[in-house]
Amino acid sequence: RAYATTAMREAKNSRIILDQIRVRTGLEVHIISNSEQRFISYKAVASKAGEFNQIIQKGTAIVDVGFGSAQISLFDKDSLVATQNMPLGSLRLRSQLSKIPVSVEGNRLHIEEIVDNELITFRKMYLRDRQITNLIGIGDNILYLMRRLGIKGGESHVDAETMHVFYDKLSQMTINQIEENFGVNSDYANLLLPAAAVYTRILDITGAEMFW
């Protein structure tokens, strides 16, 4: 079974696309709601039961960056205390940037401005008196990013400083350089910086020490 999420939910031609997928591949793609999508994502994270339960004993933010939106969920001592969906998907951000012809450095600044503006209210409402130690990143782009984060062996996390160094390097790359370094096509290469920006800016505003 295949699922489609935010980008397909909001597409005006979603029925045509789904029909074409069915005709060409035989796959029946089901468009699921935001709550269904998050349930599946969190179920996957929680499948590592021992490690997950240990992590969320301390303040933890789970950040799920999709193509159309991003979901931030805060956990504290095993309990979900807040969750918010925001229009910070990598494809949505890339679409906004495409309207503004800027340099490589300018891309980073514009993305961060968009992300920060969306996070202002969330920070005021949910982070004022809350300590976040861990940030768990999930989503469409996370595997490509984690492969280049220098994680070795059976480890599944890096500290905040390592994440920032990685983000700085990524933000200085051209699309061609990202294609070559990450082994992706140009369409996907365009999405990696927006996704990394969302993870890194949320890492900053929460003050989390570790990125999982």
Q: For the regions a protein language model found, what residue spans apply to each?
A:
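Active-site-adjacent helix-turn-beta-strand microarchitecture at beta-sheet edges
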Residues: 66-69
